[in-house]
Curated annotation (Swiss-Prot):
Sequence positions that bind Zn(2+): C81, C97, C104
Assigned EC number: 3.5.4.19
Function: Catalyzes the hydrolysis of the adenine ring of phosphoribosyl-AMP.
Entry's family note: Belongs to the PRA-CH family.
Keyword Zinc: yes
Protein name as it appears in the record: Phosphoribosyl-AMP cyclohydrolase
Keyword tags: Amino-acid biosynthesis, Cytoplasm, Histidine biosynthesis, Hydrolase, Magnesium, Metal-binding, Zinc
PANTHER family in the record: HISTIDINE BIOSYNTHESIS BIFUNCTIONAL PROTEIN, PHOSPHORIBOSYL-AMP CYCLOHYDROLASE
Encoding gene per record: hisI
A GO term for molecular function: zinc ion binding
InterPro entries cross-referenced by the UniProt entry: PRA-CH, PRib_AMP_CycHydrolase_dom, PRib_AMP_CycHydrolase_sf
Length: 115
């Protein structure tokens, strides 16, 4: 599957040919996770509305929830002003983080408003 050349021309990829992909929950606005996409992963996501990412460690594609059941149905995909990050607006089924939490930012708070 190939990415529309008009979209591909707007992407600013890193040295590995990837762009950052941030998933945000449509219902709550929660920022759920960040992963990586190459042109193929983005093309698959746009074609299927299933969030598809590229694993740098496994060097393969993965569809969110394919094994866990914690799927992301993609309602909208936006490209940021620099062209180096895409935002996926999704319906999240189950946990978004591989640790089992709702978001990947449910852990350590480095700075918060004073109590």
């Amino acid at each position: 599957m190939s990415l529309d050349p008009a979209i591909a021309a707007r992407l600013k990829r890193n040295e590995a040919g990837l762009v950052a992909a941030v998933a945000q929950e449509r219902a709550t606005g929660d920022v759920l996770m960040m992963a990586w996409m190459d042109d193929e992963a983005l093309a698959r996501t746009l074609a299927t509305r299933k969030a598809t990412y590229y694993s740098r460690s496994r060097q393969q594609y993965w569809v969110k929830g394919e094994t866990s059941g914690h799927t992301q149905y993609v309602h909208e995909v936006r490209l940021d002003c620099d062209g180096d990050t895409v935002l996926l607006i999704v319906d999240q089924e189950g946990a978004a983080c591989h640790t089992g939490t709702h978001t990947c930012w449910d852990g350590d708070v480095l700075l918060a408003e004073p109590a």
